[in-house]
Amino acid sequence: MDVDGEGDRGQNPRIMERDSDSIKDPISEPSWFTPKKLLFVFCVVNLINYIDRGAIASNGINGSRGSCTSSGTCSSGSGIQGDFNLSNFEDGVLSSAFMVGLLVASPIFASLAKSVNPFRLIGVGLSIWTLAVIGCGLSFDFWSITICRMFVGVGEASFVSLAAPFIDDNAPHDQKSAWLAVFYMCIPTGYAFGYVYGGVVGSVLPWRAAFWGEAILMLPFAVLGFVIKPLHLKGFAPDDTGKPRTDNLNVLPVGYGFSAVMKDLKLLLVDKVYVTNILGYIAYNFVLGAYSYWGPKAGYNIYKMENADMIFGGVTVVCGIVGTLSGGVILDYMDATISNAFKVLSVSTFIGAIFCFAAFCFKSMYAFLALFAVGELLVFATQGPVNFIVLHCVKPSLRPLAMAMSTVSIHIFGDVPSSPLVGVLQDYVNNWRVTSLVLTFVLFPAAAIWSIGIFLNSVDRYNEDSEPDAVTRESTAAPLLQEA
């Protein structure tokens, strides 16, 4: 019977049922790797990834160009911008270079998740990430560090499309938004720690040392990706062939993979709820991306903040933690539905935009910090709800690709163009206050787009049947995480 059924196990319901029973075999001992430990590991990896983003934007690592006064007195530059003599535009391009690798690799990793142990994919990606940041520390000009930043994006791609679905699957039913919020809380927290980390390292060591430190932090998690037992995502059934499980990265034929990805992409593009959510997210990320990169420099120039990295880092970490967690908890309290998620997104972004815009109108640094902190608190409340919509408006088997394309979209149309465009605007107007006000105004269209989603006919597809051919072929092991 095993031989006869081996060729069509992805489509035979009896075999699928038998496979489901085998997963629950009591012989398989529960793993020490509990859902909370899984969340912890993903959070730390996410934190390190965004520490890197914050560090490269910090004044300590990014630095400034050399300058000369009208009297002929010249001062040498500092950091990356000073060593490589980068213009503001080139500096903005450097912040966005990771997106090239992320754009190319995200759909590939998402499609491979149907046939390859996803933790092996994460292990490969984090290994590439580690080598890439080492390369950043060894770079010698603009193009060498830019290419290394592109490979940082390749490494990140393996992680962004798979982490959130795993968390969503293993979180308690009434705490899904809160668990997602904890994970996405690591984005502003990582940026903030990155500002502080960059400022501290840049003040005592060469800027290159910051990248080598990041590589040391990430290396254990890259190794973990290769040695941990496999997890199975909802919507991807293990194909038990009776053969020993292999961890080799065997993939489906190229033609099949490409056609499957294109078919899935079409399903995403015609989903009004998904598209509306992503359009709002793009406008939102356009602002947040430029804030994160240019914020310390703008604060230093507008308000003469002597410790801009530390101040922005402190405000961002507190507001990021409180705001992100609050958004997830509020959505769970309201009843986590797609319509309610859109309500949280539109209201918090609109009110937050008012406070952030008003902050830049004040000349007092203390008034600015107070208003901007409230604005950031509200704006960061979006992280849990926006990703809840991405995960629940599509079928389970589409979630990795939905997350991948969400990440690609918000970067390629959001923070990738925003950093260099803000640099161009600043080069033109030479006034950081005006530049910051123009940038902040973009939050209002984001709130308006998300408000449209409240009135769409939204259906939570989390419990819809998965596609019969969505099979993780290389694993016969029981699920790593089991409900208590």
Swiss-Prot record:
GO terms for cellular component: late endosome membrane; lysosomal membrane. It is found in: Late endosome membrane; Lysosome membrane. Keywords: Endosome, Glycoprotein, Lipid transport, Lysosome, Membrane, Phosphoprotein, Transmembrane, Transmembrane helix, Transport. Coiled coil: none annotated. It comes from the Eukaryota. One of its GO terms (biological process) is lipid transport. SUPFAM superfamilies: MFS general substrate transporter. The chain crosses the membrane at residues 38-58, 93-113, 122-142, 147-167, 181-201, 209-229, 273-293, 311-331, 345-362, 377-397, 405-425, 436-456. The keyword Signal does not apply. Glycans are attached at residues 62, 85. Residues 1-23 are annotated as: Disordered. Belongs to the major facilitator superfamily. Spinster (TC 2.A.1.49) family. PANTHER family: SPHINGOLIPID TRANSPORTER SPINSTER HOMOLOG 2-RELATED, SPINSTER. Probable sphingolipid transporter that plays a central role in endosomes and/or lysosomes storage. This is Probable sphingolipid transporter spinster homolog 2. It comes from Arabidopsis thaliana. The lineage of its organism: Eukaryota, Viridiplantae, Streptophyta, Embryophyta, Tracheophyta.
